[in-house]
Amino acid sequence: MSEIQQLQQQIRAFRDQRDWMQFHSPRNLAVSISLEASELLEHFQWITDEKSSKQVAEERRTQIATEIADVAIYLLELSDNLGIDLKQAIEAKLQSNAEKYPVEKARGSSLKYTELQ
C-alpha cells in the first residue's frame, strides 16, 4: 500500500468513525477544498512576495501547515471517493504539462503553453 493510500485509509477511518460520509459528497468536498484554500490564501493577502516567502512563512508556519493539511485531506478524500488514483493522476498531469511546456520553450517564462513559440 502506497503512502497516499495509507493516508486515504486514515482519512476514511476518521470520517467513518464519525458517520460523516453522509456529508462528504464530491460536491461538498470540492467546495471544502476551495474554502480551505481560501483560508490558506488569507495568510498571504496584502503582503509582498518577499514577505510571503520569508517573514510570514516563519511567523505563521503552524497555521499555514494546518491549512495546507486541510486542503490535502479533502483532496485525498475526494480522489478516494471518486476512485481516482491520485499518484497516477498526478503523473499523467506532469507528463501532459511536460509536453505542453517543453524546457527549451518554457524555461523562465510564465506564458501559457498556447502562447509559447
Spans of features found by a protein language model:
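Flexible "arm" and connector segments at domain edges
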Residues: 1-117
